[in-house]
Amino acid sequence: MTGLLAFLLIVLEWTRPSLPSPLRPICDLRVLNHFIKEAQDAEAAMKTCREGCTLSESVVVPQTTVDFDVWEKKNASAKAEEVQSGLWLLQQAFNFLRTSVTNAALHSHIDNAVRNLLSVNAVLRSLNIQEFTPQANGAEIEGTWRASSAAELLQVYVNFLRGKARLLLLDAQACQQDVS
């Protein structure tokens, strides 16, 4: 529920008609930490699930490992494209998981994960990070692999938020401005 509240606050701020300037940058990592905590809660719930919580077939997910030397050499748009492709892949994977899982308690975690992915995209928009949606299907996106279980998908989700998404937010130009 708190993820939905955070998302609604972001959307309301973004769509407010009297707002003469773009959404203020959301540089506070506590916002991302909140999404990570909820992802960890979903991962824990999945690990305790015994019935109705399987993935009917493997799904394409982003690689979560980061070679920091390679990451530092990428330009901002390449980093943004990689993270947004990963967020898109995760959203597709969660939508598929939703159709595979019959456990009602897990449905709420899956729905919350999808809302939080949309919220992370809204945070990126607030940082003036150009939106990117992959044109290819998931298998054609570079830097992917297949998750064969729901628990594996949730682990990828947590690691992606903790890794590449966090690095992109830390590097965001809008957050680098001196506030003196």
UniProtKB/Swiss-Prot annotation:
Residues 1-20 form the signal peptide. One of its GO terms (biological process) is nucleate erythrocyte development. It is found in: Secreted. Its main location: secreted. GO terms for cellular component: extracellular space. Glycans are attached at N75. One of its GO terms (molecular function) is cytokine activity. It comes from the Eukaryota. Keywords: Disulfide bond, Erythrocyte maturation, Glycoprotein, Hormone, Secreted, Signal. Pfam families: EPO_TPO. The keyword Signal applies. Disulfide bonds join C27-C175, C49-C53. Erythropoietin is the principal hormone involved in the regulation of erythrocyte differentiation and the maintenance of a physiological level of circulating erythrocyte mass. Belongs to the EPO/TPO family. This is Erythropoietin. It comes from Tetraodon nigroviridis. The lineage of its organism: Eukaryota, Metazoa, Chordata, Craniata, Vertebrata. The gene is epo.
